[in-house]
Amino acid sequence: MKQYKIVVICMCILLLLAGGVYAQQKTVRILAIGNSFSQDAVEQYLHELAEAEGISTIIGNMFIGGCSLERHVKNARDNAPAYAYRKIGTDGKKREKGKMSLEAVLADEDWDYVSLQQASTFSGMYETYEASLPELIEYVKVRLPKKTKLMLHQTWAYASTSRHSGFKNYNCNQLTMYQAIADAVKKAAKANKIKIVIPSGT
């Protein structure tokens, strides 16, 4: 089931790329600022699917397991070298650098797309987006070209049998969690004028 979700995520991203002018003009550079859910989204299959469609990509993932928007903001304020920076080049090979900061990675490429996401535990709690997302967006925007498009990654709900401690936030109910995530992401995207949502949780 998880593998199916990963493929769906990649296809959603791929459709966005294929519909843009970049698809035939240049290498598309995509950066995810996230956690293990962004690892699933961009480190598996996306390069291969894009390559099959004739789309050249450079894919970056700033990884900290379970990282929340609040923690990303703290890392930004402190310019903390807290991330594992995983980068898949046009050759499809993945390389990793440890102890990287947001500022350093944002400057590493001329990014076309940057995705942001909340940690799964808080992904259906709008107040957590409201508290941290605007500051993170402001930090990112001033360090990116004007052409860069921001995306919000809508993650999926836990399995109905999950024992994750964060599941209690949703009464341990998968449908409740899904609806909360969909509502929170929609509201956060509108409030922060993010036009692209990757609906991997649907």
What are the functions of these language-model segments?
Residues 31-33, 153:
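Short hydrophobic segments within beta-strands
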Residues 25, 52-54, 145, 191:
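Short, well-ordered coil/turn elements that cap or connect secondary structure elements
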Residues 1-8:
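Bacterial N-terminal signal peptides that target proteins for export
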Residues 98-202:
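Alpha-helical cap/lid subdomain in secreted, periplasmic
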